[in-house]
């Protein structure tokens, strides 16, 4: 298969880490290693060092809002960025975010003459609802998001559930399910590695160990876990529960553990960045508890499966796609009673947990190498369709575009001093694009 130069865009990238940033890193590394050349375009972050990456990282101007929201707000018009991408001879643009990165990708498309693919990773309507209380602003932001999605030549989603969420926002076009992979190898770690990673925790042999890995946010189903564990203890069942991760609700979660008198059986490790240490915890656990309906692509479920740890999931959730109850995972209803009943049955059948874990390792695991190979095959289809003129022409930016995108960036910024300034943001979007377009035209004219 021919090798191509792919430009990957996202609003977050190391040193800012989240699931989508991790996906972009793995896309870029595997494209560079196996399929051609990758270029990453992302907002500038003070102090970021990109020298260790085996591919170029192009940073565009941003506002540092990490202290308030944990992210930088990218300013998506930059003639320097456009010229740099043009110099890389980019053949396809792939944005992993429908906000600033999508706006930038839409403007770059005019410069590099390349098709634009978007991957929809997460339920942005929930993020928008958390960011702003104004119903009108929420609706305007969602319209802008859908506008960006509609402007792409091809839309990918990480799961069927992600596609359904996108449909619920008003998107009516086609989409392709393109699953993400995991960056851990298949197989359990050694007993010595498990002992080293878990030293200091009260984890008796023969006592079931349950595990949660992810952001400590209530919407991840943590109330269901804690209420089920309380009921399990009241039944006289011994167990241990380990929470790995951090998050905005961590203090409340810890307090609830104390209130429910579970602190002698529930432990918090904080975030664990080392992948081998994380593999050791997956290898030690009997069950991975993930009763979340928020996540569009439960990569942690596949991480657990890589180490032979079966998951307990909500029936019909995105994380449960591909899971058959009692075969390669366990399914419950979205309530603590159902989870407690499942845990009670499984604590009495440790062999079932082991057997289902082995099946999960064989059937659910997907490496990033295989995931990006699938994406690369689809890139070839997109390029062929684009070069054959099979994609419709897209409209140039309009006044409505600048108005709605101002609302979207306002909503997603979640920065107090930027609230109520949609007019300024709209003007800056309009002025920024006009200035960038003129500057780019001047530079291109000089080159030609």
Segments and roles (model prediction):
Residues 22, 208-231, 237, 241, ...:
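A conserved mid-protein helix/loop that constitutes part of the nucleotide-sugar donor-binding site
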Residues 44, 161, 181:
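Carbohydrate-associated surface elements
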Residues 149, 271, 279-285:
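Short alpha-helical donor nucleotide-sugar binding micro-motif in glycosyltransferases
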Residues 254-272:
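Nucleotide-activated donor-binding/catalytic signature segment of Leloir-type glycosyltransferases, i.e.
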Residues 265, 352-366, 370, 377:
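A short, well-ordered alpha-helix in the C-terminal region of glycosyltransferases
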Residues 293:
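Aromatic "clamp/platform" in nucleotide-sugar-dependent glycosyltransferases that forms part
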Residues 310-314:
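Short hydrophobic beta-strand element within catalytic cores of glycosyltransferases
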Residues 325-326, 330-336, 345-350:
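Conserved acidic donor-binding segment of nucleotide-sugar-dependent glycosyltransferases
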């Amino acid at each position: 298969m021919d090798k191509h130069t792919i430009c990957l865009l996202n609003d977050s990238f190391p040193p800012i880490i989240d699931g989508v940033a991790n996906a972009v890193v793995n896309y870029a590394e595997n494209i560079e290693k196996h399929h051609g050349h990758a270029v990453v375009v992302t907002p500038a972050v003070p102090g970021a060092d990109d020298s260790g990456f085996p591919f170029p990282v192009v940073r565009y101007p941003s506002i540092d809002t990490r202290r308030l929201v944990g992210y930088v707000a990218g300013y998506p018009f930059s003639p320097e960025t456009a010229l740099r991408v043009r110099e890389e001879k980019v053949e396809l643009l792939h944005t992993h975010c429908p906000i600033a990165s999508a706006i930038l990708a839409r403007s770059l498309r005019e410069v590099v003459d390349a098709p634009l693919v978007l991957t929809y990773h997460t339920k942005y309507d929930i993020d928008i609802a958390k960011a702003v209380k104004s119903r009108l602003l929420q609706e305007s932001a969602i319209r802008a998001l859908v506008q960006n999605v509609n402007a792409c030549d091809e839309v990918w989603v990480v799961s069927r559930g992600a596609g359904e969420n996108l449909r619920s926002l008003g998107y009516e076009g086609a989409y392709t399910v393109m699953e993400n992979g995991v960056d851990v190898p298949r197989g359990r770690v050694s007993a010595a590695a498990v002992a080293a990673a878990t030293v200091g925790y009260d984890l008796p042999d023969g006592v079931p160990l349950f595990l949660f890995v992810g952001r400590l946010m209530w919407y991840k189903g943590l109330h269901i876990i804690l209420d089920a564990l309380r009921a399990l203890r009241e039944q006289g069942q011994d167990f241990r529960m380990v929470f790995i991760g951090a998050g905005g609700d961590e203090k409340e979660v810890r307090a609830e553990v104390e209130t429910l008198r579970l602190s002698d059986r529930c432990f918090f490790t904080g975030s664990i960045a080392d992948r081998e240490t994380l593999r050791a915890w997956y290898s030690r656990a009997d069950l991975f508890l993930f009763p979340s309906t928020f996540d569009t692509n439960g990569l942690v479920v596949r991480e657990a499966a890589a180490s032979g740890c079966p998951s307990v999931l909500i029936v019909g959730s995105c994380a449960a796609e591909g899971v058959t109850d009692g075969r390669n995972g366990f399914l419950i209803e979205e309530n603590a009673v159902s989870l407690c009943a499942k845990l009670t049955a499984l604590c009495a059948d440790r062999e079932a947990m082991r057997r289902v874990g082995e099946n999960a390792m064989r059937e659910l695991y997907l490496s990033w190498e295989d995931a990006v190979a699938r994406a690369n095959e689809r890139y070839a289809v997109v390029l062929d369709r684009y070069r054959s003129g099979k994609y419709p022409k897209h409209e140039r930016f309009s006044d409505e575009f600048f108005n709605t995108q101002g609302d979207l960036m306002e909503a997603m910024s979640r920065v107090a001093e930027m609230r109520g300034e949609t007019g300024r943001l709209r003007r800056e979007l309009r002025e920024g694009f006009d200035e960038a377009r003129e500057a780019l035209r001047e530079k291109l004219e000089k080159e030609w």
